[in-house]
Amino acid sequence: MSTTKKVKIIVPGSSNADLTGFAPHLPAAGETVMGSSLHIGIGGKGCNQMTAAARAGADAWFVTRVGQDVFGETLRRHFAAEGFRDRYIREDGTAETGCALIEIDERDGQNRILVILGVNRNIGAEDVRAAEADFADADAVLTQLEIDLSAVAEAKRLAQAVGKPFLLNPAPWQPLPDELLCGIDWFTPNETEAGGCSGIGI
């Protein structure tokens, strides 16, 4: 009986616990508003890429960090449930797990989001180099800009060294050096990032 080889995806990226509160209206400065409900979910642009890849049937390898806290445990349970390869997921006790605090106005869906990067800001080139052996038989490498640019640049370098497609979601937008932009195979900005990188209002 023949078996189909899964597409292998490597994602160096961020992972967050998302705390979403719903309220009749968003508080003004100094105001306390009683919320109606709270949802604790999983997010981070890297984790979202991973979850989409795994659910599409890919053999998904994550390069990330989680803190030694309750949100880190929550993320690890999600990783296991989704079938993420966890060889390159590091536990980091120097800071908290990444977290997004999201306020949503129930009237119109408007929101405010505060992201605490936590251990995501520690994800660097050395984390990506630790996964170098798995780049050779990967089908694609995906990343985004919620981690240090050194990690993004190293992921691009390693992917290109073995002839693998490199995909960059340039979010959240920040100015990028020309040497990083040059040679990207797939560049996937949304409206905000497209305006930022082109200098043209969109």
Provide a role label for each language-model segment.
Residues 93-95:
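Short, glycine-/polar-rich solvent-exposed loops and beta-turns at beta-strand/coil boundaries
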Residues 1-65, 70-81:
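Glycine-rich phosphate/adenosyl-contacting loop at the front of the ribokinase-like
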Residues 2-15, 65, 73, 77-91, ...:
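Ribokinase/PfkB-type carbohydrate-kinase core domain
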Residues 98-100:
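Glycine-rich phosphate-binding loop of ATP-grasp-fold ATP-dependent ligases
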